[in-house]
UniProtKB/Swiss-Prot annotation:
The gene is pepT. The lineage of its organism: Bacteria, Pseudomonadati, Pseudomonadota, Gammaproteobacteria, Enterobacterales. Gene3D superfamilies: 3.30.70.360, Zn peptidases. It comes from Salmonella enteritidis PT4 (strain P125109). GO terms for molecular function: metallopeptidase activity; tripeptide aminopeptidase activity; zinc ion binding. This is Peptidase T. Pfam families: M20_dimer, Peptidase_M20. Its cofactor is Zn(2+). GO terms for biological process: peptide catabolic process; proteolysis. Signal peptide: none annotated. It is found in: Cytoplasm.
Amino acid sequence: MDKLLERFLHYVSLDTQSKSGVRQVPSTEGQWKLLRLLKQQLEEMGLVNITLSEKGTLMATLPANVEGDIPAIGFISHVDTSPDFSGKNVNPQIVENYRGGDIALGIGDEVLSPVMFPVLHQLLGQTLITTDGKTLLGADDKAGVAEIMTALAVLKGNPIPHGEIKVAFTPDEEVGKGAKHFDVEAFGAQWAYTVDGGGVGELEFENFNAASVNIKIVGNNVHPGTAKGVMVNALSLAARIHAEVPADETPETTEGYEGFYHLASMKGTVDRAEMHYIIRDFDRKQFEARKRKMMEIAKKVGKGLHPDCYIELVIEDSYYNMREKVVEHPHILDIAQQAMRDCHITPEMKPIRGGTDGAQLSFMGLPCPNLFTGGYNYHGKHEFVTLEGMEKAVQVIVRIAELTAKRGQ
């Protein structure tokens, strides 16, 4: 465990922020830097079958140290950080033996407060790694990367029985491209776990069904003084569309298993406007109903427009709820839960109000629930991780490897 913090601090010092709307994968050069560093470290650690694909997927194998019919299992994390907040010049603060109250984030007025983030009350006495208030931290998912690398070092350096362990580090997870170029057959695991969750004990095998909705509105602009009966204001049509979306089914009004519509961006002029929504729901039927709702709204608002004016709506599915794939293999969850209990952790099964690479991989033939990392408040300046939580994640990874070996012997 000695190098866990050192690894994490090294990884977050590299700017690996991904970029949306870019065709190339990885979308940024910084991700290549971390992937090449990890490749070098895996080689130095003595892993085999190390490959780094042209699309930035790094894979490696830790050979089994016991004989038997032991399934090969995998652990996966992503190297990119969210494009939502700066990941450049990350300057972590280490707060040892947290005693409660506000934590100043750098020099200025920014604080990490238990008033806004009550989970801090549960972390008294622990070592917290925070931002300086100017960037995100990058625990999502460099905590997972550091934990997998440390678990490999533990397994390599100790006589802990384990089967073949596969690891992979992917790019562009935050922009939805992490698993698109993942070669499941080449990876060679029967199942895997993404290490990309939150607080200690989280074990996630349910995620949103997700879709994007892009709306283009073409209006007609004339001088306002002579506009009667002629002007078609694209911005007004956009406002009418959004007014039809259920106001109590948005991210800020929902939780748990509740789905939502989210207006992520809107721009335009009288002549043209564009809107971008995301749709999320755990239930597949409700998910399909939400997509139909958006089509009905566009049809209603666009009814009776001049032929030269129109509303164009394009819906694209992003990923689906992996539950239906993971529950077909209950032993995957059983092993993870037992590993947590063996490490004196109470498993907390909760839905992911988002997505992971594991969601797409599960539909590609690699069942892949999500393990905790010990991090909180991702994608912003209030992001932090606990050293104790990271250590627990390493212990759980190692124990999963050990329990899997016992099942096959």
